[in-house]
């Protein structure tokens, strides 16, 4: 059974044990401090799980969040990798400003793969092994 691990106005995190990944569903306009706070909470959750895969869903993100893009790329991703992240499927938003921010935050690593639709991202995570 799926387990909701975090629910805030800007993000919902759910663990899917049958396929062993966490789904991070970002919602609405993302304020800089909310990204930092929620990102830290996601990191703490991930550190406690025996899980190595993330489905990062930006389909519901509205507007830019570029002020936190550097932090995401330079701090959050390295910390997630230290915590055991091996596969990160990133579903990009349709919103052009949110997409620009996501592109800025995307690290140069084989761990992170960009997808334009949810089903392709989910299918990829189900086929990769940790």
Enumerate the language-model features and the residues they cover.
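Amphipathic, Lys/Arg-enriched alpha-helical "gate/interface" segment within cytosolic domains
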Residues: 2-130
